[in-house]
């Protein structure tokens, strides 16, 4: 018994011995019947060729387009000869399709005219699938990722032909994924060498500052002492919080100040009075 590999080799040997692969086509998907009623001849024809090139589109964007040139090519044509009996049907790939990777009988490769540019792939006749960064019927237009919002640059986006890149402010560089701008790593700072006598001076300044802090804490306790006293006396006066007691105390002080002014006024009046002696 032959294996599948041996059968495939034998099949290609038969094709090579026959000198042609036209007879291996059979009516199937993307394979069409070509009626022949005469012999074949070689003829010339004018063939269109599309040459891609880069140009500038609106908005100063780079676009890939094509120019059309014409050249002389050769092809096999079939002519009907008078008096000859029509030959049996022949088969070939339908218009818009060609053989897949040179294999006979398999018409699975689509044909796009003009061809797809910028590494685009022809998925069906006249239809291209464009790679990332390109768009258009033949993948000839550059996608501006910075304007469409597809770019994920944290600070500044720079569009390029078929792609983009992120730019950070001076002193920063983009992260590996391009999402963040990180500070550039510089040389490690060198610790300054200690100067003789500086340690004792700093220690003395620390002691002075600590003494000043202690004095301020004592003054703060003196200022807060009356408030603590008011807070402890608030339940005695039926007040709910120290703030209410403080307001009540201020009212009492206002009354005392008013009485003091009245006493001072009476003292002035008494000083201006004089008693008359009886004669």
Swiss-Prot record:
The keyword Repeat applies. InterPro entries: Dev_Signal_Modulators, EGF-like_Ca-bd_dom, EGF-like_dom, EGF_Ca-bd_CS, EGF_extracell, EMI_domain, NOTCH1_EGF-like. Residues 108-140, 142-182 form the EGF-like domain. Disulfide bonds join 32-94, 57-63, 93-107, 112-122, 116-128, 130-139, 146-157, 153-166, 168-181. One of its GO terms (cellular component) is cell surface. A motif (Cell attachment site) lies at residues 131-133. Residues 200-224, 250-274 form a coiled coil. It is found in: Secreted, Extracellular space. Keywords: Angiogenesis, Calcium, Cell adhesion, Coiled coil, Developmental protein, Differentiation, Disulfide bond, EGF-like domain, Repeat, Secreted, Signal. One of its GO terms (biological process) is vasculogenesis. Residues 1-21 form the signal peptide. One of its GO terms (molecular function) is signaling receptor binding. Residues 28-109 form the EMI domain. Pfam families: EGF_2, EGF_CA, EMI. It comes from the Eukaryota. Regulates vascular tubulogenesis in vivo. Inhibits platelet-derived growth factor (PDGF)-BB-induced smooth muscle cell migration and promotes endothelial cell adhesion to the extracellular matrix and angiogenesis. Interacts with ITGAV/ITGB3 in an RGD-dependent manner, increasing endothelial cell's motility. This is Epidermal growth factor-like protein 7. It comes from Rattus norvegicus (Rat). The gene is Egfl7.
């Amino acid at each position: 018994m032959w294996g599948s590999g041996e059968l495939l080799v034998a099949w290609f040997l038969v094709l090579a011995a026959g000198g042609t692969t036209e007879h291996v086509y059979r009516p199937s998907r993307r394979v069409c019947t070509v009626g022949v009623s005469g012999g074949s001849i070689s003829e010339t024809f004018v063939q269109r060729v599309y040459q891609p090139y880069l140009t500038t589109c609106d908005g100063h964007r780079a676009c890939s387009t094509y120019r059309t040139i014409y050249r002389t090519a050769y092809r096999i044509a079939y002519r009907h000869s008078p008096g000859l009996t029509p030959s049996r049907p022949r088969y070939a790939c339908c218009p818009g399709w060609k053989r897949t990777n040179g294999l006979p009988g398999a018409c699975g490769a689509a044909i796009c005219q003009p061809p797809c540019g910028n590494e685009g792939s022809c998925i069906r006749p006249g239809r291209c699938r464009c790679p990332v960064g390109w768009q258009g019927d033949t993948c000839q237009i550059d996608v501006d990722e910075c304007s469409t919002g597809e770019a994920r640059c944290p600070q500044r986006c720079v569009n390029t032909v078929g792609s983009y890149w992120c730019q950070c402010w001076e002193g920063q560089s983009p992260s590996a994924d391009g999402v963040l701008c990180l500070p550039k790593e510089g040389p490690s700072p060198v610790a300054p060498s200690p100067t003789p006598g500086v340690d004792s001076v700093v220690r003395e300044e620390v002691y002075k500052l600590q003494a000043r802090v202690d004095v301020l804490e004592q003054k703060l306790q003196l200022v807060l002492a009356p408030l603590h006293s008011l807070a402890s006396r608030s339940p005695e006066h039926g007040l709910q919080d120290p703030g209410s007691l403080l307001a009540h105390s201020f009212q009492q002080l206002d009354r005392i100040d008013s009485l003091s002014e009245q006493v001072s006024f009476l003292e002035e009046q008494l000083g201006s009075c004089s008693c008359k002696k009886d004669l």
